[in-house]
Amino acid sequence: MPVNDPVGDMLTRLRNASRARHDKVVIPHSKLKLEIIKVLKDEGYIGEFVVHEQTVQNKRTVFPEISVQLKYGPDRAPAITGIRRVSKPGLRRYAAAREIPQVLGGLGISILSTSRGIMVDSEARKQKVGGELLCTVY
């Protein structure tokens, strides 16, 4: 069954795997998803990630996937307590540099798609660039 919102699907997979205390989660590959995962790793919300290819048996089809290692605290509390899609396919949300909202008073991050690439809210404010609010993580 086709997915209408690939980024939303990725965020849901991360949220569900984190709440179920899984060690890793496998996500279908795309350039946008890979950039978001790089930002999550840089911010310390996830561990390592590996891009690999899965071949379907008896077919010559190859599907690239991203295997993400999830992070947990000392008491097995997930590093990602909340992850939410902001800009959706049915209602896109954009913000100028001075209008980018803070998440939980600065304790969380917003991930934006800007003209200079995918970045967190603090970096976008520093570079004075706005963009599409993809998601919030806390």
Curated annotation (Swiss-Prot):
Sorted UniProt keywords: Ribonucleoprotein, Ribosomal protein, RNA-binding, rRNA-binding
Top-level division of the source organism's lineage: Bacteria
Organism: Myxococcus xanthus (strain DK1622)
UniProt name for this protein: Small ribosomal subunit protein uS8
GO biological process, one term: translation
Record GO terms (molecular function): rRNA binding; structural constituent of ribosome
HAMAP family associated with the record: Ribosomal_uS8_B
Subunit structure: Part of the 30S ribosomal subunit. Contacts proteins S5 and S12.
One Pfam assignment: Ribosomal_S8
Any one of the GO CC terms: ribonucleoprotein complex
Physiological role: One of the primary rRNA binding proteins, it binds directly to 16S rRNA central domain where it helps coordinate assembly of the platform of the 30S subunit.
Record family assignment: Belongs to the universal ribosomal protein uS8 family.
